[in-house]
C-alpha cells in the first residue's frame, strides 16, 4: 500500500511549493491535496485509505484549520493520524490554539524554502518512521 500525505491548503501556489519542497527532501510518499477543511473531512471519511500524515493550513475558506483539526481529533478513525498545522501568518496566538486543538506540530511557511524544507523533513522523519 502506498503511503499518502494529505495537504489541506486553499492556495495552489502553496500546495505546489510544498510538493517541490517534499520532493527535494527525497520523501517517497504520495501527495494528495484538497482545498478546504470540508473537503479534507469528506476525503478522510470516504472510506479510502487514510493518509499517514496531514499537513493542514491554518487559514482555509469556510471551516478554519483549527475547526477542521477539532473534527479530526474527535473522530475515532482519524484521531491517531499525525497532523502538522502550517501557516504563513506570524501574528496572533495561532500556534498555541493549534496545539490546544490537538496539532502534533506547528510549522511556519518560511520565505526561505531551504529552511521550510529542513523543518518539514525533520517533522516528517519524526512522525513517519519507516
Model-based region annotation:
Residues 56-58, 87:
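Active-site residues of response regulator receiver
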Residues 2-22, 54:
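Conserved acidic segment of CheY-like receiver
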Residues 60-62:
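Receiver (REC) domain active-site loop signature in two-component systems and cognate sites
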Residues 111-123:
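C-terminal output helix
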Residues 33-53:
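Acidic, metal-coordinating helix/loop segments flanking the phosphotransfer/catalytic sites
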Amino acid at each position: 500500500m502506498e503511503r499518502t500525505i494529505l495537504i489541506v491548503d486553499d492556495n495552489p501556489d502553496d500546495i505546489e511549493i510544498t510538493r517541490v519542497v517534499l520532493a527535494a527532501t527525497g520523501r517517497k510518499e504520495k501527495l494528495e491535496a484538497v482545498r478546504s477543511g470540508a473537503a479534507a473531512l469528506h476525503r478522510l471519511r470516504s472510506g479510502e485509505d487514510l493518509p499517514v500524515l496531514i499537513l493542514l493550513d491554518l487559514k482555509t475558506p469556510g471551516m478554519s484549520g483549527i475547526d477542521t483539526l477539532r473534527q479530526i481529533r474527535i473522530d475515532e478513525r482519524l484521531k491517531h493520524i499525525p497532523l502538522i498545522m502550517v501557516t504563513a501568518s506570524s501574528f496572533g496566538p495561532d500556534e498555541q490554539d493549534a496545539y490546544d486543538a490537538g496539532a502534533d506540530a506547528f510549522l511556519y511557511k518560511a520565505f526561505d524554502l531551504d529552511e521550510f524544507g529542513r523543518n518539514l523533513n525533520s517533522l516528517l522523519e519524526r512522525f513517519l518512521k519507516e
